[in-house]
């Protein structure tokens, strides 16, 4: 045997040994983790984190929202949930099942009873009375596309007909975003999905519990120290992650056989000043002093209603540093007061995009929504940003459409629902081959059916007033104007309790199975008739066995 043939026989042995070592290094820890995971499950340590768990609704089988689903995405004590929902296991023939995906704006915050999905539901019921529609809103506070995707994945088996995606506001501040306080931030898609999987296991839950302290949810003020400039390289990864998640969510939805509507996100431009601003990095001390003097003089002129003169000084300041979000907002406001609405809108949008507390979907997020929707067959686009802008005489979304930064008013929710309704009506017409009357119920008709009373308008305005008394809203340059607008609505015109009750009773008579109507009526009645309130709240029970309480904590079911 020659040397060359001997080397060929001997050489594979070290390679096999290395392969064995590598395989052992991988498989043994995995096996140990598997044993630990199985042991924890057998010992009932931890909780399931699937989106849906079995339940019954009035004795009929259903899948209900799992209150532990969001735990992998939030620190202990800060878990946020959607408006609770249950999906019937038996889908009746002819039923059209719609799932709404998104964050708090999609959910309908500040009150899901009057979110766009509720308007959509009554529109469909009124115009297509012979069909049954199920509109399930899965939107939730503080989540983003990293959470929306697993929600869609687990809803895909529930025989959906349509997914409506209204998402993009929380890509920076939500889980795994560069400005978040909820999880590790700014990770790649593989790292994010691995983290979600590990945190969902019983082993991951135990390690997370041991390694973290329980925290209290404090809303938007928790993020004050998490400013992310538009120029940050982290934004590039944020946009890439959002697009990847959006495409994957659409793919999951389409694979289920459902149609998909993607909506752009409407944000308040005109009446929501930036939450925080930052100067460009390379600004010299001399340039900063010059900028501050121009800014100071411009503010004095603006306060004196000398908008043209103020605009000149603001423009000079922007030539020194054009990255300061508040300056862009002042330029926009001056242009608006000079009736140059087109230019004003551009600067309002840039002020939003430069805001370093990134609670609003920026121009790039909406560009991704448009691009992705138009690039995939059978996906429809509802350009809410454009549609709601066009509803304003000046073409700029303000507080009549969006309460504060992103949450839609009744008018905003109605306009968004109307566009989604028209898409669905067109689809139903094409499927049946018939001419279907797609006239949209008026906003007033919808609000009668939803029992949006003067009492509720005032109640919601008071809730928004309370929110705006905390940072970061108190840091906005137009904070006092925002408070005045909401205070005026909160005072409102007087409505007697009897009138309010009659409006609820009329709506419930039209839709006796509407749990949301019963819930809101019960909450209203609590101040007048505890027994009647308990009865109504009991009828709003999301599924059998779920505890129902009065506002004072008394359990009624």
Model-derived features: positions:
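Serine-dependent acyl-ester chemistry module
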Residues: 3-10, 168-371, 384-399, 422, ...
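Membrane/wall-proximal cationic-aromatic binding patches
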Residues: 43-128, 391
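Short, well-structured alpha-helical segments in soluble
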Residues: 148-162
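Short coil turns that delineate tetratricopeptide repeat
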Residues: 160, 322-323, 356, 512-513, ...
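TPR alpha-solenoid repeat register
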Residues: 327, 517, 549-551
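Accessory beta->alpha helical hairpin/"wing" motif in late/C-terminal subdomains of nucleic-acid enzymes
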Residues: 408-411
């Amino acid at each position: 045997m020659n040397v060359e043939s001997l080397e060929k026989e001997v050489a594979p042995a070290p390679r096999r040994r290395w392969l064995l070592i590598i395989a052992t290094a991988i498989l043994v820890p995995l096996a140990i983790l598997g044993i630990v995971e199985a042991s924890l499950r057998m010992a009932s340590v931890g909780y399931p984190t699937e989106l849906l768990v079995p339940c019954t609704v009035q004795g009929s089988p259903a899948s209900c929202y799992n209150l532990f689903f969001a735990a992998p995405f939030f620190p202990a004590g800060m878990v946020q949930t959607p408006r609770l929902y249950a999906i019937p296991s038996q889908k009746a023939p002819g039923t059209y099942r719609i799932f709404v995906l998104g964050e708090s704006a999609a959910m309908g915050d500040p009150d899901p009873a009057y979110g766009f999905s509720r308007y959509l539901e009554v529109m469909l019921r009124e115009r297509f009375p012979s069909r049954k529609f199920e509109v399930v809103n899965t939107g939730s506070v503080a989540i983003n596309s990293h959470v929306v995707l697993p929600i869609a994945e687990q809803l895909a088996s529930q025989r959906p007909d349509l997914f409506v995606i209204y998402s993009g506001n929380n890509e920076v501040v939500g889980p795994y975003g560069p400005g978040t306080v909820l999880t590790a931030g700014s990770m790649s898609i593989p790292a994010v999905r691995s983290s979600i999987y590990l945190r969902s296991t019983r082993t991951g839950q135990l390690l997370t519990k041991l390694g973290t302290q329980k925290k209290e949810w404090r809303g938007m003020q928790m993020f004050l120290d998490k400013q992310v400039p538009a120029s940050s390289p982290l934004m590039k990864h944020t946009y890439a992650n959002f697009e990847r998640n959006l495409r994957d969510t659409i793919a999951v939805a389409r694979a289920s056989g459902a149609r998909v509507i993607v909506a752009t996100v409407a944000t308040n431009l005109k009446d929501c000043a930036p939450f925080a601003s930052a100067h460009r990095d390379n600004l010299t001390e001399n340039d900063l002093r010059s900028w501050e003097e121009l800014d100071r003089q411009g503010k004095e002129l603006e306060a004196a209603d000398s908008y043209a003169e103020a605009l000149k000084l603001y423009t000079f300041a922007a030539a020194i540093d054009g990255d300061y979000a508040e300056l862009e907002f002042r330029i926009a406001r001056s242009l608006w007061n000079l009736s140059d609405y087109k230019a004003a809108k551009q600067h309002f949008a840039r002020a939003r995009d430069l805001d370093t507390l990134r609670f609003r979907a920026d121009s790039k997020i909406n560009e991704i929504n448009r691009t992705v929707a138009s690039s995939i067959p059978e996906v429809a686009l509802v350009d809410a940003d454009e549609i709601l802008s066009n509803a304003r005489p000046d073409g700029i979304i303000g507080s009549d459409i969006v309460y504060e930064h992103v949450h839609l008013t009744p008018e905003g929710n109605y306009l968004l629902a109307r566009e989604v309704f028209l898409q669905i009506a067109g689809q139903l017409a094409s499927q049946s081959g018939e001419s279907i009357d797609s006239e949209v119920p008026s906003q007033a008709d919808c609000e009668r059916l939803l029992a949006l009373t003067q009492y509720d308008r005032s109640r919601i305005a008071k809730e928004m007033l309370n929110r705006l008394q905390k940072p970061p809203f108190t840091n906005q340059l137009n904070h006092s104007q925002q408070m005045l607008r909401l205070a005026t609505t909160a005072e409102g015109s007087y409505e007697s309790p009897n009138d309010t009750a009659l409006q609820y009773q009329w709506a419930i008579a039209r839709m006796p199975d509407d749990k949301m109507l019963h819930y809101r009526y019960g909450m209203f009645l609590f101040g007048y008739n505890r027994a009647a309130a308990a009865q109504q709240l009991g009828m709003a029970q999301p599924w059998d066995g779920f505890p129902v309480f009065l506002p004072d904590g008394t359990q009624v079911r």
